[in-house]
C-alpha cells in the first residue's frame, strides 16, 4: 500500500515522502522541466492548455505520467491509487486534463496549496481518467499536494464529484479507503500518534 506523509519539523522545515508499492515495474524516471513549457491536457478535443510558471522535478510512471514531484516553490504533488475513485462522464464543454498530467498541472501552476485549492474550486476544467497502459483497468487515483509551509490538500473524485480536503492536519494519506474514511479511522485511533 502506498503512503504519503508530510513532516513539519523545527525551524520551518517541511518534508514530504511517499512509498511506491506497485506490483509491476512502472518504468520510472526522473524528469526535470523548466518554466515556460507549453503544455497540453492530452485529452484530445478541448484539451486544457497552459504554459508552466514554475520549474519542477518529477518521477514518471510508464513514460507517460508525472506521479510525484516538487516545483521550485516547494509545492509537492503525489498521485496514489484509489480503487473507490469514480470520475464524471467527459463533458467536452470544459477543457480536459488527463489524469496522467494532474500532478504536472499542479506543479506547473501553483506555489502554494491555497492557490491550488482556490483555482480548483473555480471548476474550470475536468480531470479525465483513462485505461492503465496494460489495458487492464481504469486508472483510479487521488492527488495530494503539500507546500513549504506544511499546508496540505487531498483531491478525490468519488461518485463523479470532486471533493477537496484542505488542512495542515492532513499529513498522511494512503491508497484506500476514501479520505473521509481515513479521517474517521484517524479519530478512532489517537493512540497511534501519541
Identify the role of each PLM range.
Residues 82-84, 112, 123-125, 148-151, ...:
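Short acidic/polar capping segments at secondary-structure boundaries
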Residues 62, 98-99, 137:
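Short, glycine/acidic-rich beta->alpha junctions
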Residues 133-193:
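Extended amphipathic alpha-helical segments with heptad-repeat/coiled-coil character used for oligomerization
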Residues 46-60, 110-114, 118, 181-194:
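A short, charged
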Residues 118-134, 142-145:
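Secretory/export targeting leaders with adjacent low-complexity proregions
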Residues 1-95, 122, 127, 131:
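A contiguous strand-loop segment
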Residues 29-32, 39-43, 101-104, 168-171, ...:
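Glycine-rich loops and low-complexity Gly/Arg-rich segments
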Residues 93-124:
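Alpha/propeptide regions of enzymes that mature by internal proteolysis
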Amino acid at each position: 500500500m502506498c503512503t504519503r506523509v508530510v513532516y513539519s519539523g523545527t525551524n520551518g522545515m517541511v518534508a514530504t515522502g511517499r512509498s511506491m508499492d506497485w506490483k509491476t515495474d512502472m518504468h520510472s524516471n526522473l524528469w526535470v522541466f523548466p518554466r515556460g513549457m507549453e503544455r497540453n491536457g492530452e485529452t484530445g478535443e478541448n484539451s486544457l492548455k497552459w504554459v508552466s510558471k514554475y520549474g519542477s522535478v518529477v518521477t514518471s510512471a510508464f513514460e507517460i505520467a508525472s506521479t510525484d514531484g516538487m516545483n521550485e516553490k516547494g509545492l509537492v504533488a503525489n498521485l496514489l491509487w484509489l480503487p473507490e475513485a469514480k470520475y464524471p462522464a467527459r463533458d467536452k464543454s470544459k477543457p480536459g486534463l488527463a489524469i496522467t498530467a494532474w500532478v504536472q498541472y499542479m506543479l506547473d501552476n501553483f506555489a502554494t496549496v491555497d492557490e491550488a485549492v482556490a483555482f480548483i474550486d473555480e471548476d474550470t476544467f475536468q480531470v479525465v481518467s483513462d485505461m492503465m497502459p496494460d489495458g487492464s483497468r481504469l486508472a483510479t487515483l487521488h492527488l495530494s499536494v503539500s507546500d513549504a509551509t506544511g499546508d496540505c490538500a487531498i483531491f478525490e473524485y468519488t461518485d463523479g464529484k470532486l471533493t477537496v480536503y484542505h488542512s495542515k492536519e492532513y499529513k498522511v494519506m494512503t491508497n484506500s479507503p476514501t479520505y473521509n474514511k481515513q479521517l474517521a479511522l484517524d479519530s478512532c485511533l489517537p493512540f497511534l500518534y501519541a
